[in-house]
A protein has these predicted regions:
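Generic N-terminal amphipathic, Lys/Arg-enriched alpha-helix
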Residues: 3-29
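Active-site phosphate/pyrophosphate-binding segments
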Residues: 15-25, 34-41, 46-49, 167-265, ...
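A residue-level signal for conserved active-site and pocket-lining positions in enzyme catalytic cores
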Residues: 30, 162, 322
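Glycine-rich phosphate-binding loops that contact phosphosugars or nucleotide phosphates
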Residues: 45-191, 209, 272-280, 284-297
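C-terminal active-site/capping subdomain that shapes the small-molecule cofactor and substrate pocket
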Residues: 257-338
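Short, small/acidic-rich helices and loops at N termini and domain boundaries
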Residues: 333-349
Length: 349
């Protein structure tokens, strides 16, 4: 018997840990008060030459969003780092921001300690754990975020905290107004995508049904890489479904050649409502090429949103809903991550 996405009682039995409630809460994070660091960030201000945002998993996803959003506003180079070793440029002129919701991420802790040895200015972000203790030992600022169901469900809290860190370090202007505007658009998306909205009016339920039984291949413009990567990760963690992503225009110079056969692949192109003429040309050429070569019919995900932050958060929220509905269609509780936990246990031996 297939799952009825309009049967709230049936869906609640599948979503035993209530991941849907965590997704519903996402807009509220950007409407509420912002957590300020326990130690003044005046202590880390200096003439920075670079910024490194360190994280893994859901914590790194927050860093991805922050850089896609604020990279153009930052006066110095910045990158997201995802391994324990550090690049050679990290030194005393680097602002090193470690994001770890659990505070126990081994790669993040190792990189944080190495950054300390190199004299970098340090900031920690998370919900306690060893990172908070290390920040206390190092007398480094620490921003504590609110509790959440899982690290990936703390995306909003981590984005806000990272933006606050950059503000307090005098690298960007206040982002509170832009967050409030983005929250208003997120509330509208929640209204359309929440579990009570019927399938015929719910774009997230419709997309989940289209994805069921397929291997999603995701594409987005380079400036929206955080959205594509987040959706790929949410399909893995929530839907327990393999997917991949690539970015344009780069994908038009290599990956497009692989679309001679469709197999069970379903291309999904993530777009926004404010593309330039050049961007529209890139997306149109790519879509037409893979469609004609593979006879596939790419899905397009486009959310009307204004503002640099809204253009990222709006599709992220929509696609987070999709990943939970797809898990329900597959009769899978979205929350447990047994293989991730097994991997971490093996790494700790």
């Amino acid at each position: 018997m297939p799952v009825d996405l309009d049967d709230v009682k049936q869906l609640s039995k599948i979503d035993q840990s209530n991941m849907m409630a965590a997704v519903d809460r996402f807009p509220d994070i950007f409407l509420g008060p912002r957590n300020e660091p326990q130690v003044s960030l005046k202590e880390v201000r200096s003439s920075f030459k670079s910024v490194v945002l360190m994280g893994m998993g859901g914590s790194a996803s927050a860093a991805d969003v922050v850089l896609d959003w604020l990279r153009a506003a930052l006066p110095i180079p910045a990158l997201v780092h995802r391994e324990p070793g550090l690049p050679s440029f990290v030194n005393s002129r680097t602002l090193f921001i470690a994001l770890s919701y659990s505070g126990e991420t081994s790669e993040t802790l190792a990189a944080f300690r190495e950054a300390k040895k190199r004299g970098s200015s340090l900031v920690g972000i998370g919900h306690g754990g060893s990172l908070a203790s290390i920040c206390s030992d190092f007398k480094a600022p620490y921003i504590q975020v609110e509790a959440s169901l899982a690290p990936r469900a703390a995306l909003g809290q981590l984005i806000v905290a990272a933006a606050v860190a950059l503000e307090k370090a005098d690298l960007i202007r206040s982002t509170s107004r832009e967050m409030s505007k983005a929250a208003q658009e997120l509330v509208r998306i929640r209204r359309r995508c929440r579990i009570e909205t019927p399938l015929e009016d719910n774009p997230a339920k419709g997309l989940a049904l289209r994805l069921l039984g397929h291997f999603p291949v995701l594409y987005a413009l380079q400036r929206m890489s955080s959205v594509a990567r987040r959706f790929k990760n949410q399909l893995a963690e929530n839907s327990k479904l393999l997917a991949k992503y690539d970015l344009l225009p780069e994908g038009g110079h290599n990956e497009v050649e692989a679309w001679h056969e469709r197999d069970n692949l379903l291309p999904v192109i993530i777009r926004d409502a404010q593309e330039t003429a050049v961007e529209r040309s890139i997306l149109r050429a790519f879509r037409t090429t893979i469609s004609s070569a593979s006879r596939s019919h790419p899905l397009e995900v486009r959310v009307a949103a204004r503002g640099n932050l809204s253009k990222l958060l709006s599709p992220i929220l929509l696609l987070d809903y999709v990943s939970v509905y797809l898990a329900m269609l597959r009769r899978i509780d979205p929350t447990p991550n047994t293989l991730i936990n097994e991997y971490k246990k093996r790494m700790s031996r």
